[in-house]
Design a protein with these regions (language model features):
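C-terminal regulatory/interaction regions
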Residues: 1-112
Length: 112
């Protein structure tokens, strides 16, 4: 699956997102300089915390509009980003869920 979308920060930029079953490849293209930047590799991982975060209403709503959702798991926090709308540091509009040690939701938020 390949998507090419306008870059959300650069009016002369485009973002290419290649989705395979177990990873994403992403690269930005800038019309002012021509050529692609280096491709970024994002493995799609599954684990109990990621799956538990999907119970969150906020995450379910986020996943409804996100075309390229990607989850980052750090300790007991799962952060979902849409790869169309992010920087190289995966900073953007996010849905975050904090889980306890039993994978029960204790806090959730959506925003920047």
């Amino acid at each position: 699956d390949v998507n090419v979308v306008p870059h959300f920060l650069n009016p002369f930029g485009w973002r290419t997102i290649v989705k395979e079953p177990d990873y994403y490849l992403i690269s930005d293209f800038d019309l002012t300089i021509g050529g692609f930047k280096e491709f970024q590799y994002y493995p799609i991982l599954g684990n109990g915390k990621l799956e538990a975060s999907r119970k969150s209403l906020i995450v379910r709503q986020f996943l409804e509009f996100s075309h390229s959702p990607y989850a980052l798991v750090e300790n007991n926090t799962v952060k979902w980003v849409d790869l169309r709308l992010t920087t190289d540091k995966l900073e953007s509009f996010t849905a975050e869920v904090e889980l306890d040690d039993n994978n029960e939701i204790i806090h959730e938020r959506i925003g920047l």
